[in-house]
Curated annotation (Swiss-Prot):
Keywords: Cytoplasm, Methyltransferase, S-adenosyl-L-methionine, Transferase. It comes from Mycobacteroides abscessus (strain ATCC 19977 / DSM 44196 / CCUG 20993 / CIP 104536 / JCM 13569 / NCTC 13031 / TMC 1543 / L948). It catalyses: 2-heptyl-1-hydroxy-4(1H)-quinolinone + S-adenosyl-L-methionine = 2-heptyl-1-methoxy-4(1H)-quinolinone + S-adenosyl-L-homocysteine + H(+); 3-bromo-2-heptyl-1-hydroxy-4(1H)-quinolinone + S-adenosyl-L-methionine = 3-bromo-2-heptyl-1-methoxy-4(1H)-quinolinone + S-adenosyl-L-homocysteine + H(+). Its EC number is 2.1.1.374. This is 2-heptyl-1-hydroxyquinolin-4(1H)-one methyltransferase. It is an enzyme of class 2 (transferase). It is found in: Cytoplasm.
Amino acid sequence: MTENLQDMFESSYRGEAPEQLAARPPWSIGQPQPEILKLIEQGKVHGDVLDAGCGEAATALYLAERGHTAVGLDAAPTAIQLAKGYAAERGLTNVTFDVADISNFTGYDGRFGTIIDSTLFHSMPVELREGYQQSIVRAAAPGANYIVLVFDKAAFPPDIDGPHPVSEPELREIVSKYWTVDDISPARLYANGDGFQDGGAQRFAEFREESNGWVSMAGWLLQAHRD
């Protein structure tokens, strides 16, 4: 992960990002993303779980509370500090967290039965994707599942400065080099509505204001596995 990108996420988790209107980053919604939650409830998670680019680790914490052994990795030390604090508050001993470059990490070879990427994929520079895929494949156990929730490129204006969303063919091409892709389907990604500046969200296609104060945008939900 580049130093500038790490600094950007650090300022977000500290509540210091100039474009951030709320104390927490808009993507920190206090629970797993609903699309990920559906797959968890459908029994798509097995074995030890890697929450890749975990942030404040809502997914890893949720799974640990339900008996899974989970690991959360993120490049932002403040996010990891927050995640460790939440785990301690809940008395969870089956989840661990560490600061790591998700595009080049070691120490977990062949461990994880499920790897979950909840909005990480579009958060890293394009040039880091290959290293990221190689790192998580190295960490995957035989038969591992890989789940990705990522922004759809069609929902973003072409001059956007920030995330790196993907088209369905682009996502399939990248992931299929390393995994057997089982499904890619349209999805929604949710965020706290108070984290957006007035009028700024109207530049995005398929932007929705939800009844619970969240907002949502179009994305892709990928499911894949290792043979």
